[in-house]
Amino acid sequence: MRGRLCVGRAAAAAAAVAVPLAGGQEGSPGGGRRGSRGTTMVKKRKGRVVIDSDTEDSGSDENLDQELLSLAKRKRSDSEEKEPPVSQPAASSDSETSDSDDEWTFGSNKNKKKGKARKIEKKGTMKKQANKTASSGSSDKDSSAESSAPEEGEVSDSDSNSSSSSSDSDSSSEDEEFHDGYGEDLMGDEEDRARLEQMTEKEREQELFNRIEKREVLKRRFEIKKKLKTAKKKEKKEKKKKQEEEQEKKKLTQIQESQVTSHNKERRSKRDEKLDKKSQAMEELKAEREKRKNRTAELLAKKQPLKTSEVYSDDEEEEEDDKSSEKSDRSSRTSSSDEEEEKEEIPPKSQPVSLPEELNRVRLSRHKLERWCHMPFFAKTVTGCFVRIGIGNHNSKPVYRVAEITGVVETAKVYQLGGTRTNKGLQLRHGNDQRVFRLEFVSNQEFTESEFMKWKEAMFSAGMQLPTLDEINKKELSIKEALNYKFNDQDIEEIVKEKERFRKAPPNYAMKKTQLLKEKAMAEDLGDQDKAKQIQDQLNELEERAEALDRQRTKNISAISYINQRNREWNIVESEKALVAESHNMKNQQMDPFTRRQCKPTIVSNSRDPAVQAAILAQLNAKYGSGVLPDAPKEMSKGQGKDKDLNSKSASDLSEDLFKVHDFDVKIDLQVPSSESKALAITSKAPPAKDGAPRRSLNLEDYKKRRGLI
């Protein structure tokens, strides 16, 4: 018979043990067991452990059941009384099995919440484990030690504390290294190695895999912490740098303010001293005046006749009075002079400029500089004023700075400034920087707030004082005087010379040339050859400029005339080509009977001159022989008959003998090419051209179109 031992385990309650026999009864000690192999299965939470064995010793089974029940009761009572802290397994370890002997005890099952199936191959091992559990149940210390022992994959509190302290110490050090308590082979100390050796191969691989995953997670966290620490360190360094820079700026501003305050204090102390002296002198004068008033009042009150000594004092008294009056005059003069000096040294508006509007009062625009650049007062008026100068571009935007004019210089380049030309430049100062700029780079716009603050910072950093309101008022007055300046003849001559010096060409070449010729003649008369040579060079230069301007002026005109002449020649050539082509077409054209031709009648009698006709007849007779053309003498006779001056007898003879007229020999074999005869026939039939241009005859269709019939 085979017997089975089932051990059930609940999640929250105490462990309960049931041993079903082969016949289905629980707890009967008489069950027998047969078989040579045993199998143990452990399920999660509501699992059961089933042990099949074929040992013949039934008494050992009963003892084992009793020992297991007693052990479970003891563990429950001990846990209720003592309630010792149980170390929880690590979250990252997924191993739920172990090779320890506590798996066969109920105490260890009470502490654990999960388990895995396990097989026992030998019967002797089961007996040894049962004996061990029995011995452990008998001793409370052993059971408590076993219950408090950490499971596989768990980390004890001491280990966690040590690891946390080590991590803190490592984090405090700069060269931190990752360490999770295991070596490179994922094994710990000797106890850990022994415990892993006791596991099966599958459990060992699972445990190592869990450790690898845990190591990766911890390593990732370690790297993230390290990066965060480095970032925090960088932020701290940057903050420290910023704080140091701010402190330096504050120190500079404090130093500058202290300098300004010390200077103001010195000025105030001097002013107070002068005020004290002045107040003392005034008090003395007041006291003397009061004394005099008191004396006169006493004398009037007494109304007694005045003595000569009282009215006319002695010389000594007069001298004393004179001395006192001189002293009072001196004190008043000194006080007035002190006041004047104080006004000069410490004007009422001695405060430095604080707004861009105040500085804009002495700003010069490019338009003003263009008007004044040739004036005699230019250098004097401009020095001390301010301009808005362009220094270049930044991100495709122009950049301007506030600069003070310290002087006027002449540059090597002559440039165009509006409607005039000049070579003058402004020497500008911005803080410690000084540079020469041309007038064309000055802006017409006013100073902005940002530009004003930039200039103010540059002045403070250079340790220079800002201009006061009194200086600005004085400069503004000088600008107004320049606007209302009255010119004299000498100023006008200087302005004209200055403008002519930079002018490319004179406004009137003829006038300039005549003036130079006069000067040359005067120099030659006086015998000054050097001056005459200089004037001749000027004349040559003037002629060259005039020729260059003439070439430039007539350049376009000559080009246009050349184009017109070329077009005319081309039109003539094209018209000749068209005439030749039309004549060829006329020759090759066949006769059209429907074409209307010009048929202007001609009077035969008046058609030709008789002398010309006789010459033609003589040529024809010489070529073809006499009597070839009978029509010619006939026409001749007709013409002579009509004419009154001709002989009537010859005409009557020709008209009477008609047979003789037709009695002549005709040569048929003529040595004339056919092409020539054809050409003669065509030319004779063609209408005469008018004005040398061919004229095409109208056909019926063109005629109807012109008349509006079609």
Swiss-Prot record:
Residues bearing the modification Phosphoserine: 53, 626, 650, 655, 697
Chief location of this protein within or outside the cell: nucleus
Compositional bias per record (Basic residues), positions renumbered to this chain: 110-130, 228-240
Phenotype for residue 401 to E: Loss of binding to single-stranded DNA
GO cellular component: Cdc73/Paf1 complex; nucleolus; nucleoplasm
Phenotypic consequence of residue 434 to A: Reduced binding to single-stranded DNA
Residue ranges with Low complexity bias: 158-170
Biased composition (Acidic residues): 53-65, 312-323
A Pfam family reported for this protein in Swiss-Prot or TrEMBL: Plus-3
BP GO annotations: blastocyst growth; chromatin organization; endodermal cell fate commitment; negative regulation of transcription by RNA polymerase II; stem cell population maintenance; transcription elongation by RNA polymerase II; Wnt signaling pathway
Protein's cellular compartments: Nucleus, Nucleoplasm
Region described as Disordered: spans on this chain: 20-214, 228-357, 627-650, 674-710
Organism domain of life: Eukaryota
Chain positions with Phosphothreonine modification: 55
Keyword Metal-binding: no
Residues forming coiled coils: 526-560
UniProt KW Phosphoprotein keyword: yes
UniProt free text on domains: The Plus3 domain mediates single-stranded DNA-binding.
Function according to Swiss-Prot or TrEMBL: Component of the PAF1 complex (PAF1C) which has multiple functions during transcription by RNA polymerase II and is implicated in regulation of development and maintenance of embryonic stem cell pluripotency. PAF1C associates with RNA polymerase II through interaction with POLR2A CTD non-phosphorylated and 'Ser-2'- and 'Ser-5'-phosphorylated forms and is involved in transcriptional elongation, acting both independently and synergistically with TCEA1 and in cooperation with the DSIF complex and HTATSF1. PAF1C is required for transcription of Hox and Wnt target genes.
Name of the protein in question: RNA polymerase-associated protein RTF1 homolog
Source organism of the structure: Homo sapiens
Gene: RTF1
